[in-house]
Design a protein with these regions (language model features):
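Hydrophobic membrane-insertion alpha-helices, especially the h-region
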Residues: 17-35
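Substrate-binding cleft of extracellular glycoside hydrolase catalytic domains
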Residues: 39, 44-61, 77-160, 166-171
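Aromatic-lined carbohydrate-recognition surfaces of secreted/lumenal glycan-active proteins
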Residues: 170-183
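Functionally critical loop-and-helix segments that line ligand-binding/catalytic clefts
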Residues: 2, 46-59, 190-191, 195-261
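Sec/Tat-exported extracytoplasmic proteins
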Residues: 70, 78, 97-100, 126-130, ...
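Glycine-rich, charge-decorated loop segments at or immediately adjacent to ligand/cofactor-binding or catalytic sites
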Residues: 115, 181-188
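N-terminal Lys/Arg-rich, disordered targeting/topogenic segments
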Residues: 1-15
Length: 261
């Protein structure tokens, strides 16, 4: 038989100390968070080639207020899953290109949906243009689907979409992903596919140390002309490395202002 112990409660005079301790712990926590965020900003500033990505969540963007010289690349959300189309994609696509931005499109991949259907949704939505950046497949952790399907099943469907986009656009697709998803699903696979890593609290280092191409280092960016906070990204390498990357995509010899299409 267990004995119910008497629970002691702090005296009234000790409450100020508890409050003080809580305040100190909160300040320490905030300080650590601030340190990591500032460290990320400092690290990202080492890379000269900057860009951003947007979707309908950013609302009406004043593209004429943003400089293509400051932001060398822009990615726009186009589709999600098998049938969702971003309502701002066409407008953003036309206006960003009109202002001379180098533009690409991305698809938010749904792990529980068929890869072929998702590829078709993207292909029906995103124009095939020789002056566009490679297509991006956004792969993110989904506990329900990851626990429903085996790693092999997930990789098979991702491969289907990857291959269909490669065949249609003639450019090697890029995988946008997090450390968690990469380390669980993608590690040691798709070794020729460029990686775009989301990492806000440290360096974009992955299991096996694969080279990354883009790094989304914050979701709290501010850009004049965009009414909300926005994701900011950098390209790994110098400006000459960026030119070499564009040359491999057949994109370097572009006019200053791209035609409206």
């Amino acid at each position: 038989m267990s004995v119910r112990k008497k629970v002691s409660t702090p005296s009234k005079t000790s409450y100020p100390y508890y409050i003080l301790a809580c305040v100190v712990m909160l300040c320490v926590g905030l300080g650590i968070t601030y340190f990591f965020l500032q460290n990320n900003v400092a690290s990202a500033q080492e890379y000269p080639v900057k860009g951003f990505d947007v979707s309908h969540h950013q609302g009406d963007i004043q593209w004429q207020s943003i400089s293509p010289q400051e932001f060398k690349f822009v990615y726009l959300k186009a589709t999600e899953g098998g049938d969702f189309k971003d309502r701002k994609f066409q407008d953003n696509w036309l206006k960003a290109r009109e202002q001379g931005f180098l533009v690409g499109a991305y698809h938010f991949y749904r792990l529980c949906r068929d890869g072929q259907i998702q590829a078709q949704n993207f292909i029906e939505t995103v124009p095939k243009k020789t002056d566009s950046l490679p297509p991006v497949i956004d792969l993110e952790y989904d506990s329900t689907c990851i626990n429903t399907y085996t790693r092999e099943q997930l990789l098979k469907e991702i491969q289907v979409m990857h291959d269909q986009l490669y065949q249609h656009y003639g450019l090697q697709p890029i995988f946008y992903t997090s450390k968690a998803f990469y380390n669980i699903v993608l590690v040691d696979e798709f070794k020729q596919t460029p990686l775009w890593i989301r990492e806000y609290q440290g360096q974009p280092e992955l299991k096996g140390n694969p080279k990354w191409t883009f790094w989304q280092h914050t979701s709290q960016g501010q850009i004049k002309g965009i009414p909300t906070l926005v994701d900011l990204n950098v390209f790994q390498g110098s400006e000459q490395d960026w030119i070499s990357f564009l040359e491999r995509q057949g994109l370097y010899q572009l006019p200053q202002n791209l035609p409206i299409k």
